[in-house]
Every structure is written in structure tokens, then in C-alpha cells.
Amino acid sequence: MPEHQFTLKNATVVTPDRVIEKGVIDIENGRIKQVREQSDSTPEDRNALDLSGKYIFPGFIDLHVHGGGGGSFNSVDPLDHEKARSYHLQHGTTSMLTTTSTTEFLFLEKVLASLSASAKAPSKGSRVLGIHTEGPFISPKRNGAHHIPLILEGSIELLDRLIFASNGSVSMVTVAPEIRGGLELIRRLISKKIVASLGHSEATFEEATKGIELGATSTTHTFNAMSPLRHREPGMVGAVLDADDIFCEAILDGVHIHPVAFRVLLARKGIDRVNLVTDSTSYAGEGDGKFSRPDGRTLVKEGNRIVIEGSDTLAGSSLNMNLALKNCLKFSGIELHDLSKLASLNAAKIIGLEGDLGSIENGKIADLVVLDANFDTQAVMMEGVWARNDLS
């Protein structure tokens, strides 16, 4: 059999609509040629790799990731970018939106230019599908860990500068719709086919709903840093729960949201409108301790929890997508085929790449994650090539 053709067999293959217990995946030229079920009548292929006892999921897609493995995407150093991409690939993330956070505007332009360039360079890390800019067009009342002096009002001119600096790589922008110029930003993003994601917002129900009506299709880390659901003022949480079509990010590290809140989100939005993200920082994969930020503040990492020193303000996570998937199973007990949607397919739909990515289906790119019985990553494949292979 030529090297560009091979077969994986006897694994539990997780597709969007079913789980194939004795699944076979034929791969050719970096794509999935056929997904089928092993049967006694199937001729034995001695070249096939037997993955008995393993699960095969589609490669995970993370649309909100700031760094990992000691590397940050809020950096102009391509070595930082490579550290983070390599770390997350090892944990099953085959595609991502590299995500920036609020920083000094001129520096942010340089960061975006650097991210765009490094995304095109050879890498041993996750594929970069674009850039998600989280800030600076957010509410100072719901800033989270974003430095208030650097938060800006909505400006078409400044937005266009960021898009230009990124060489058109900006694919998603977090916006608070209620800030001055916020709705104009959403209109501009939609006109440029960039995803507008609502977040870091003190919006009323009406203000958030207006943003959705204008075309916002995503919600940044649902429940976190947004106006909560109250019985007389439903806020942004109420607006995104009430709207049928908008997607909702969820950070499942056991810190950002309670498992019950996640189950409520799933019950209201449905499996097809929730996507798992990490919101991980450069400290993902690092030990506990104190870390200095460029803005002069200190972060404290203890286990899964990262906060600004002297406060309870969360500052991203130390999560990876493999752990998010395991937590999702623990918190919700959903079916495996639904889990694959939350970890992969829904994210691909948000950015319009579901034709090639996000699921194990005939004709799609062969991005795969092999998990053991404990759902720990054993191997990762990108475009039919092993990027990690710990299979015995």
C-alpha cells in the first residue's frame, strides 16, 4: 500500500451522528476516504493499524486560546507562538484561533502582524485558522482580567487598523454591544465576514439582543464577564439563552462555571449551539506559582485556578481541550457523538469550515485524536500525518 494510503481499524470511531464500535477509517492523501464498520466479511488488511481499545475523535478545534506551554499569543515573538501551538497539539487541538487580549493598541497591531506571519511559517503545532481578538472593544464594567486603562470605545477606524495589521487574518472579534460604537463594530464585522462574538459586557437584555439581531453569532466564555440572568433584567446571559441561533463558548475547567450552569446551558441551547474552549494562558502546562504580567500585575496559579493577585478575578485558564472533553463527560454525561460536536464540529461551523474540518466523515481532512480508555490523548494526526504517536 502506498504511504499516502493507510487504514485505522478496530477503534471506537466517534462520528457526529453515531459511534462505530469496530470502526475503520481509510485515509488517502491527507483526507478521510471512507468511514466504515469492521465486519467478519471484510478482507484483512495487514497494513492497517489496529487500534483496539482506543477511541478516535475528530481533531479538537479551539476558538479561544491565549497560549500554553509557556508561550503566549499576546507576543511578537514567533517562538512564543510555536510553544503554545505545540503544547495544544500534544493535547489534541489540531486547529485554533490564536487569541489576543487587551493591550496597548500600537503593540496589539504588532502582535497581530506577528501572529499572521507565524501562522504561515512551518510549525510543529496546531493549525492556525485565524485570529480572535478579545478586546479592546469591551466594557470596563465587565473587564475581567483585561486592564481597564487599555480598554477602548468602539471605533471603525481602529477596528480596520487591526484587521489591516493582521493581513486579514482576524476571524473573530469579541465586542460589548452596549459600548459607544459597539453596534457599529458588529455591523462592520459582519460586512467583512468576521465573526462578532458578544462578551465582556454589561449589556441589558435589549442591548444584547440588538447585537444578535445585527448578526453576532457567538458568545465569548458564556456566563463569565457578562451581565447575568436576573428575573427582571435578563441581561446578556438571558439574551443568548433566549436566542436560538447564537453559539455559546463554555470553559469547562471546573472553575469558570458550575457543572449545573453548564447543564442548563446545554438544555436550553442544545448540543448544536455550544462549543468548548480553553481560554488558556501561557501558564497552561506550567506548575503553580506567581507570574508577572507585562501590565505590571501579578497572577497566581494554583491548580486549575489562575487569578489576579489580591483578588478573585479569574485570568484565563490552565485548560487544554483534552481535559475540557473529559470534564464535559463528567459534568454532563452526554453521548460521545454529541461530545465530538462540542469539541470540534460546532467550532468549525462558527467559522464556516465544517466542509473540511470538525468531524470524521468521508472527504474531510484527516485530523484525528486517538484517546485511550481513560480518554487521555495517545496520538494526534493532522492531514493524515502523525503529529504525536504514543501508540504501543
Segments from the language model and where they lie:
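N-terminal metal-binding scaffold of metallo-dependent hydrolase/deaminase domains
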Residues: M1-P43, M381
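Charged helix-capping and loop-helix junction motifs
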Residues: D77-D80, V111-L115, I156-E157, H231-V237
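Divalent-metal coordination cores built from histidine and acidic residues
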Residues: R85-S169
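Conserved, mostly hydrophobic/aromatic
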Residues: T133, L189, T219, C328, ...
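His/Asp/Glu-enriched, well-ordered alpha-helical/loop segment
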Residues: G235-A250, G254, L266-T278, A284-V370
